[in-house]
Amino acid sequence: MNTGIPKRSARMDMGFYALNKLASAGIVVLLLSLLDWAWPSGADQASEWLGLYMPQEHWVYGYALTASLAADAILTFLPSLHKGKQAAVYGAVGFLFFALFTGGHPEQLWLRAAAGTLTLLLFLWGKHAFSSNSLATPFFALAVPLLCWVI
């Protein structure tokens, strides 16, 4: 039975998936930039607390995006899960990824892991919030990170 909805190709689905991930990263970059603008010494203070001294772009696009892709890969091997269980998987991946792979001082392990969990939960929110037919998706994927970088 034809429902009138055209079927998309696998390439188009992958493109929308990538755009969704970039939009989620854009939200995280925007929130970190707003925190940096509202509290100018906050970025240095947060880096000191976490024991990491890297630009926020590396944190978001290097670590968080990779961890989000790993969480999605794990979710593909599991049966369909409710949003709460998806959040648990994302949180666990964020916790482990940021605790184990970001280096830094071991004293800040729990803070890094908690920050990774919160960051990945924002990626999960973006996964559900950004749709393929919304203009907000390309805006947050492309325009917001560029504006945050320029300003």
Give short role names for the model-derived ranges.
Residues L35-D36, L100-E107, C148-I151:
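C-terminal TM-helix exit segments that contain a strictly Trp-centered aromatic cap at the helix terminus
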Residues S134-I151:
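Final/C-terminal transmembrane alpha-helix of multipass membrane proteins
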Residues L100-A136:
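Membrane-helix boundary connector in multi-pass membrane proteins
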Residues M1-N2, A113:
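Disordered, low-complexity tails and leader-like regions
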Residues N2-F101:
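Membrane-associated alpha-helix detector
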